[in-house]
């Protein structure tokens, strides 16, 4: 069978690491194409001004967000998450893996982001707000100098009701886009893949979102969503595989993180680097954050992606250089994982190419380890995440194993989701982790 110009045996011979990947083993890949940040960033079409523009837009919308989502009032309508020290978890990791990773371990709490409880509240909500603003400005309902809390009026909601928003999702992107679009007054449809969790579908329907379920994976859900949207001139399709707006929405996080690190007195320099571990699905969220981090910290930050052993799409795409032209299914990998947000078989080529000169590396993690770390974190720090969100905790362990850490480094695990998970499902996930721990 031809896979992007070669047969399976030729690919395995050309890239020996693929032999382990197709057996769904945990692997580590160091990116051979990484360049100094200044060179890598200079190659890219997106610039710092694009991210600054996104930040300004989010500030314009802050009065509206504060008025319709009371949980954001304390932050003045900005959608932001805490930066949390997790020293007890660091001790637990050292114990579990017989290591002693030097440096401080922090968790970026995007599991607690208001509105939709995941990293997708950054890019997803931003792109919907940008689209809403362009419609309002084009129709002269609003100017960029106005108080955006005016958007909460019935008249504006009525205006938006003649427009539709469509997205394909494994879960969390659909939640963020569904919630904000419905709140604004848009007609919104989320096409969900077969691995999307039932509670996410239920929550969307409760908020008035139309959910279309597919018996295929993420790529098919996106394809069907795009088809539906293309048939309606008043419909706007949010494309997780190619969206620049999603990407810059995520990148804003890096500029806010800089302030949070300063507040904690944490320096980020080449001698005191920041290692950031980001769970990766199709790539938009971690890619956008990594891009922002490179803009802010340059070579003083090292970004790593974490993928499930059964859904290593970005790893295969970047390793082979074939990006979106190759999928995990091409190699007989089933794309079945409890980390539903990461259950993607084909990566974003846009993100893979953006990351080629910037990303330090990618590692994979098996589902049993995700559940084990989920239970460990709950016990150590009282923080409850969904399985995909703990993938970053495995990063410092992988670095130590290979002697790649620096004694003065700060380790930052990006917790991508969890606060919206129903209590009984979280309890089941936790118990599974406890049971797996006992068996190990």
UniProtKB/Swiss-Prot annotation:
This is Probable D-serine dehydratase. It is an enzyme of class 4 (lyase). Its cofactor is pyridoxal 5'-phosphate. Pfam families: PALP (PF00291). The gene is dsdA. InterPro entries: D_Ser_am_lyase, Ser/Thr_Dehydratase, Ser/Thr_deHydtase_PyrdxlP-BS, TrpB-like_PALP, TrpB-like_PALP_sf. PROSITE patterns: DEHYDRATASE_SER_THR. The modification N6-(pyridoxal phosphate)lysine is found at residue 120. The keyword Metal-binding does not apply. Its EC number is 4.3.1.18. It catalyses: D-serine = pyruvate + NH4(+). Keywords: Lyase, Pyridoxal phosphate. NCBIfam families: D_Ser_am_lyase (TIGR02035), PRK02991.1 (NF002823). Belongs to the serine/threonine dehydratase family. DsdA subfamily. GO terms for molecular function: D-serine ammonia-lyase activity; hydro-lyase activity; pyridoxal phosphate binding. GO terms for biological process: D-serine catabolic process; isoleucine biosynthetic process. The keyword Lyase applies. It comes from the Bacteria.
